[in-house]
């Protein structure tokens, strides 16, 4: 965001700011990182003995219909569908081919079973390894549900309103893994989803970092209710003023406002650690490049299942290897 450096006189410095060279970085573990990227696309598939035994659902002991396939089988199929961008019938064919190539005597859930079970599937919660304090980065983005494609809009325009959902995620700044994910309607305020994201996290939160859209009392109240010692790094909105108790009992926001007034926004970002927020934007970019920018599901429950499986899949891919880099210019 080059404009923030010259907000007061940007019309005089536009060309100079845009011509400023971008920072350059060098990856220090290129061979290991390249190998991890190749492993993300590997078609090597195997079934452990435990997975074979758990493929069929355990018989119910209560009244009601019996599930034929376990949650493991449904999760496996829906995850492969997501990674390879398949329709449900194509997913059924892929799983059938894999099981046939491995010579296993396992039945394959059909497309209607995958669709039905996706509505009730309980995806295991995202678990963060104990690696130290959690600096939580929060942001949201839009995911398409349907409507005219980009080329059709560019060529002919569109008379139909496009449908969207909002993806809300919380990212661990240290590992880059997604630790919380929610989906909502496009008109839901980002701040309204903070409670739902915090409910998915068991670890203590050292810092909560988000953009100015989260500069609301209900956000700071929700974070403080969970842990009063959590640092809340959210830039105050334009025109913000200190609280009435700023002289006697200043809030974190009051301290931020004073520092910004004294030293400027950029100095505050560097000193506070707010610049870590770029990592959640990288996670959103990774989601759209790997999973896609469109939801395949059409109901609230299956959308939630899709989001949870996507987050778990991205975390597994990230666990294969991450780049280490240093700035060189």
Model regions and ranges:
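Acidic, contiguous segments within the catalytic cores of piggyBac-derived transposases
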Residues: 35-38, 42-55, 251, 264-280, ...
